[in-house]
Amino acid sequence: MKKLSTYIFPILLLVVSCKEEEKKPKVIYEDAKAVVAPIQKDTTQIKIADLPIHIEGTSFLVHPMGEYSLTDGSSKSNSGASSAYDKDESFKVSNYNDYEITGYISNFKFQKIGSDSLRLLTEKPILIETVTYLKTVSDKTKQQILVYTLADMDTNKDGKINSNDIKTIYLSDISGNKFTKIGTDFQELIDWNLIEATSHLYFRTLEDINKNGAFDKTDKVHYHFINLQNKDWKVEEYSPIN
């Protein structure tokens, strides 16, 4: 009996701790209309930027910006690497490959080649995870367009914008101008895809129908597309399953 209780007690502790660590909702609803909560400033972080990226075929340099965390008297990057100075990891904000920039990026600055001036993408607090240059659209329509997946609202009301908030989708031109949200507030971006033959950008979002703060199979999937040959970037909704 003594041996049995020795095994049961840790299991009970594990069950209790798992219940305490239940996944927090991505959305906390207050009123019918969106409330913009103040973002808490983290005084342990300093702003840094990667060296500029030149996307082939464009006349702009892109400067990814992020944050470098200083904790417990030592330096820590967003990736979790800890050291006094680690040139390979600690100061790296983003990665670039095949016309796509990835990372946890707080903003961008754009610089036209031949100019010394840098232009900020947005004044809003955001967290960008991916930026994709639509090269085939540029080749076909002469429009140089970037697609962003990012969080732009503190939807779970924890005082910060991070990967625990709802992800949405934006577009801009290669200079950072026309930075436009094409997703809907409080709808989680599922995925997006470019049909090169028609220059149509398709994307899906999930609406929290039951307002339980979580996104699951009981909620509604919305289907959208944009004809990128049109410069107004008008979003159309369609129903492939009806």
Locations of regions flagged by a protein language model:
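Bacterial signal peptide processing site
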Residues: 18-22
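Short beta-strand elements that form the blades of beta-propeller/WD-repeat-like
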Residues: 42-103, 141-157, 199-206
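Conserved beta-propeller blade repeats
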Residues: 127-147, 186-202, 238-242
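Post-signal peptide N-terminal segment of mature Sec-exported envelope proteins
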Residues: 27-51
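Acidic, glycine-anchored loop motifs typical of Ca2+
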Residues: 155-163, 208-217
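Beta-propeller blade signature
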Residues: 106-112, 162-175, 218-230
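Sec-dependent bacterial lipoprotein signal peptides
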Residues: 1-16
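Beta-propeller fold detector
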Residues: 119-124, 179-184, 232-240
